[in-house]
Regions:
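Residues lining hydrophobic/aromatic ligand-binding pockets adjacent to catalytic sites
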Residues: 1-137
């Protein structure tokens, strides 16, 4: 509350943040993250289906596990945040028939959290902002 109290859209966004924290029990960080992702996505009109990776084989780790998940979903492209560019080898994905791309936001505010952006820009502007991106290799 103190960090965002002076932001332009605080009065509109903060009640939603309170809802997220009040609805969620102490079961796990990943469960809370999924709750937040779904709730904020709904508010922004994002209809992408999300799934837990728990149901997939845990035989591999890291990049190999992502490739396994992509293959089991018959995905021909994997998109990651641009901050992960140094983590993955595009050639390894390519050899499995999967394009590896990174999402580069048009606003160049890659260091800000979604809460930072919502507090500064509000739901409507953020909804438009998330549509402005470039997929890079």
């Amino acid at each position: 509350r103190y960090a965002y109290g002076k932001e332009k859209h605080f009065d509109d966004i903060y009640p939603h943040i309170e809802i997220l924290f009040s609805r969620h029990g102490p079961d796990s960080v990943s469960s809370f993250a999924m709750t937040c992702l779904t709730y904020i996505g709904d508010q922004l009109g994002i209809t992408t289906k999300t799934r837990w990776s728990l149901g997939y084989s845990k035989e591999n780790k890291g990049q190999e596990r992502l490739i396994d998940i992509c293959k089991s979903e018959k995905a021909d492209m994997y998109i990651n945040a641009i901050g992960g560019k140094e983590l993955y080898n595009p050639d390894d994905f390519y050899l499995e028939g999967i394009e590896l791309r990174f999402i580069k936001r048009a606003d160049n505010e890659n260091d800000l959290s979604i809460i930072d952006i919502l507090m500064r820009r509000g739901w409507e502007e953020t909804s438009e902002l998330v549509k402005q991106y470039e997929l890079v290799e």
